[in-house]
Amino acid sequence: WILDPAGRWKTSTRVALLRYADNGSGYFGHERRQVTQELEWESERWLFRVGGTAGRIDFEVQTVGVGVDLPARLADDYTAELRLERRLNSRWSAFSAYNWERRRSNDPIASYRVNEGLLGVRWSWER
Protein backbone atom coordinates (compact mmCIF):
# COMPACT_ATOMS: atom_id res chain seq x y z
CA TRP A 1 0.00 0.00 0.00
CA ILE A 2 1.24 3.47 -0.85
CA LEU A 3 0.27 5.91 1.89
CA ASP A 4 1.02 9.30 0.32
CA PRO A 5 0.64 10.89 -3.13
CA ALA A 6 4.42 11.15 -3.63
CA GLY A 7 4.83 7.41 -3.01
CA ARG A 8 7.42 7.85 -0.28
CA TRP A 9 5.49 6.02 2.45
CA LYS A 10 4.63 2.36 1.86
CA THR A 11 3.26 -0.35 4.08
CA SER A 12 2.74 -4.05 3.62
CA THR A 13 1.06 -6.80 5.59
CA ARG A 14 1.65 -10.51 4.98
CA VAL A 15 -0.16 -13.43 6.52
CA ALA A 16 1.26 -16.92 6.02
CA LEU A 17 0.35 -20.50 6.83
CA LEU A 18 3.21 -22.89 6.13
CA ARG A 19 3.13 -26.65 6.56
CA TYR A 20 6.37 -28.64 6.67
CA ALA A 21 6.48 -32.42 6.32
CA ASP A 22 9.38 -34.84 6.23
CA ASN A 23 9.43 -38.12 4.31
CA GLY A 24 10.08 -40.23 7.39
CA SER A 25 8.47 -40.55 10.80
CA GLY A 26 7.11 -36.99 10.78
CA TYR A 27 9.42 -35.87 13.61
CA PHE A 28 10.33 -32.66 11.77
CA GLY A 29 6.78 -31.95 10.59
CA HIS A 30 5.25 -28.72 11.85
CA GLU A 31 2.85 -25.94 10.98
CA ARG A 32 3.80 -22.26 11.11
CA ARG A 33 1.33 -19.38 11.20
CA GLN A 34 2.68 -15.84 11.05
CA VAL A 35 1.81 -12.23 10.32
CA THR A 36 4.33 -9.59 9.18
CA GLN A 37 3.90 -5.81 9.09
CA GLU A 38 6.35 -3.36 7.47
CA LEU A 39 6.43 0.41 7.09
CA GLU A 40 8.91 2.06 4.71
CA TRP A 41 9.83 5.63 3.81
CA GLU A 42 12.06 6.27 0.81
CA SER A 43 13.47 9.41 -0.78
CA GLU A 44 16.07 9.87 -3.49
CA ARG A 45 18.94 9.26 -1.03
CA TRP A 46 17.39 7.79 2.12
CA LEU A 47 15.52 4.62 3.07
CA PHE A 48 13.94 4.03 6.47
CA ARG A 49 12.22 0.73 7.30
CA VAL A 50 10.58 -0.63 10.43
CA GLY A 51 8.88 -3.99 10.63
CA GLY A 52 7.88 -6.88 12.79
CA THR A 53 6.69 -10.46 12.66
CA ALA A 54 4.71 -12.59 15.09
CA GLY A 55 4.20 -16.29 14.56
CA ARG A 56 3.48 -19.65 16.12
CA ILE A 57 4.92 -23.07 15.33
CA ASP A 58 3.03 -26.23 16.30
CA PHE A 59 5.04 -29.45 16.07
CA GLU A 60 3.08 -32.57 15.16
CA VAL A 61 5.25 -35.32 16.67
CA GLN A 62 7.80 -33.62 18.94
CA THR A 63 6.86 -33.47 22.61
CA VAL A 64 8.25 -31.70 25.67
CA GLY A 65 9.08 -33.16 29.07
CA VAL A 66 9.45 -36.57 30.62
CA GLY A 67 6.75 -39.09 31.37
CA VAL A 68 3.43 -40.13 29.88
CA ASP A 69 0.93 -38.01 27.92
CA LEU A 70 3.45 -35.27 27.09
CA PRO A 71 2.37 -31.97 25.53
CA ALA A 72 3.29 -31.26 21.92
CA ARG A 73 6.17 -28.85 21.40
CA LEU A 74 5.25 -25.32 20.35
CA ALA A 75 7.06 -22.04 19.84
CA ASP A 76 6.04 -18.40 19.57
CA ASP A 77 8.40 -16.29 17.44
CA TYR A 78 8.64 -12.48 17.47
CA THR A 79 11.00 -10.33 15.41
CA ALA A 80 11.50 -6.60 14.88
CA GLU A 81 13.72 -4.68 12.47
CA LEU A 82 14.76 -1.05 12.25
CA ARG A 83 16.89 0.00 9.25
CA LEU A 84 18.28 3.31 7.96
CA GLU A 85 20.10 3.41 4.63
CA ARG A 86 21.78 6.27 2.72
CA ARG A 87 22.58 6.01 -0.98
CA LEU A 88 26.08 7.34 -1.62
CA ASN A 89 25.95 6.97 -5.42
CA SER A 90 24.33 4.68 -8.01
CA ARG A 91 26.14 1.59 -6.68
CA TRP A 92 27.13 2.21 -3.05
CA SER A 93 25.07 2.79 0.08
CA ALA A 94 25.78 2.89 3.81
CA PHE A 95 23.36 1.39 6.32
CA SER A 96 22.64 0.89 9.97
CA ALA A 97 20.22 -1.75 11.24
CA TYR A 98 18.94 -3.19 14.49
CA ASN A 99 17.27 -6.62 14.64
CA TRP A 100 15.56 -8.15 17.64
CA GLU A 101 14.30 -11.73 17.90
CA ARG A 102 12.59 -13.67 20.65
CA ARG A 103 11.40 -17.26 20.77
CA ARG A 104 9.18 -18.48 23.59
CA SER A 105 8.63 -22.21 23.76
CA ASN A 106 7.30 -24.79 26.15
CA ASP A 107 10.76 -26.38 25.72
CA PRO A 108 13.06 -24.15 27.84
CA ILE A 109 16.14 -25.12 25.82
CA ALA A 110 14.50 -23.75 22.64
CA SER A 111 13.67 -20.34 24.17
CA TYR A 112 16.00 -17.43 23.45
CA ARG A 113 16.44 -13.70 22.74
CA VAL A 114 18.76 -12.11 20.19
CA ASN A 115 19.77 -8.46 19.74
CA GLU A 116 21.80 -7.63 16.65
CA GLY A 117 23.24 -4.32 15.49
CA LEU A 118 24.67 -3.86 12.02
CA LEU A 119 26.66 -1.05 10.45
CA GLY A 120 28.02 -1.42 6.95
CA VAL A 121 28.30 -0.52 3.31
CA ARG A 122 26.60 -2.23 0.41
CA TRP A 123 27.49 -2.47 -3.28
CA SER A 124 24.82 -3.13 -5.90
CA TRP A 125 25.43 -4.26 -9.48
CA GLU A 126 22.03 -2.87 -10.54
CA ARG A 127 21.97 0.63 -12.00
PLM region descriptions:
Residues 1-127:
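Gram-negative and organellar
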